[in-house]
Regions:
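Canonical Rossmann dinucleotide-binding motif of NAD(H)/NADP(H)-dependent dehydrogenases/reductases
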Residues: 4-35
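Conserved Rossmann-fold SDR core element
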Residues: 27, 87, 164, 174-189, ...
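Substrate-binding pocket helix/loop in short-chain dehydrogenase/reductase
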Residues: 100-101, 108-113, 203, 207
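A short, exposed helix-loop element centered on a Lys and neighboring polar residues
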Residues: 124-125, 168
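C-terminal substrate-recognition "lid" of short-chain dehydrogenase/reductases
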Residues: 130, 218-242
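Catalytic loop of short-chain dehydrogenase/reductase
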Residues: 138-162, 167-176, 188-189
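A glycine/serine/threonine-rich, flexible loop-to-helix segment
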Residues: 176, 183-211
Length: 246
């Protein structure tokens, strides 16, 4: 764990359950006050908020579909009203559903594009008025954006690769504003609810052949990487998190 302080910093995390909960608690332990937004998982977001509040942090929970520009603007307005600023934006909203090439439908493209591309773009663009020089944006791409592919996830891979491209392109425009943007490119971290345990173990085995590790170790490394990126003074980076298996 990095021994630095985020006291006085306001962090917006899109997605307050699963890995989002671990990240929120990790940032709260360093002193950050939090904004947790959710689309459907209110209970999980509230549970995360309770954990952060027990650490003495101020937490706001907001319902927000990050793919909807109007909804994102409302969330930004609430953040401005309550906190006046935003120091760190962590973009975690994601879907991970298998679909073979022959069975891809228009809806598969639409859902992946909405969540990964629009759901990354709108919070960044609309939050900029609240962000001062020295602020940080942390997006989540995928290891396939910079390394080996795996079958059965084409819409996911294409749209997550777009997040990596967006990160590098935005870094050029945000540089003069003094705002840093970087992306994490992880392998599989936590099993999605709609994937069987057998399929999940197959995905993990293919991803971590060189370094067999537990889900707990993977999650902690993800949390630690997010924390590190809250302090870096570089921008446009794509940080692999796959334990060397590119």
């Amino acid at each position: 764990m990095i021994s630095k302080s985020l006291k006085g910093k306001i962090v917006w995390i899109t997605g307050g359950k699963r890995i989002g909960q671990e990240i929120a608690v990790g940032l709260a332990q360093l002193g950050a006050d939090l904004v947790l937004s959710y689309r459907r998982s209110e209970k999980e977001a509230q549970d995360t908020a309770k954990k952060a509040k027990k650490l003495g942090r101020k937490v706001s929970v907001i319902k927000c579909d990050t793919a909807d520009s109007e909804g994102v603007q409302k969330a930004v307005n609430e953040i401005k009203k309550e906190f006046k600023k935003l120091d760190i934006l962590v973009l975690l909203a994601s879907i991970f559903k298998p679909v073979s090439l022959e069975k891809i439908m228009e809806g598969d493209w639409d859902s992946n594009f909405s969540v990964h591309v629009k759901g990354t773009f709108w919070p960044i663009q609309l939050s900029l008025p609240l962000m001062k020089p020295g602020s940080h944006i942390i997006a989540v791409s995928d290891r396939t954006a910079i390394g080996r592919m795996y079958p059965g996830y084409l819409p996911y891979i294409v749209t997550k690769s777009s997040v990596a491209a967006m990160t590098k392109a935005m870094a050029i425009e945000l540089g003069p504003k003094g705002i840093f943007i970087n992306s994490i490119a992880p392998g599989p971290v936590l099993k999605p609810d709609d994937i069987s345990e057998k399929e999940w173990q197959k995905i993990r085995a293919e991803s971590f052949i060189k370094y067999p590790i537990t889900d707990k170790e993977t999650v902690q490394e993800f949390v630690d990487t997010v924390i590190r990126l809250c302090f870096v003074r570089s921008s446009g980076g794509i940080y692999p998190l796959d334990f060397g298996h590119l």
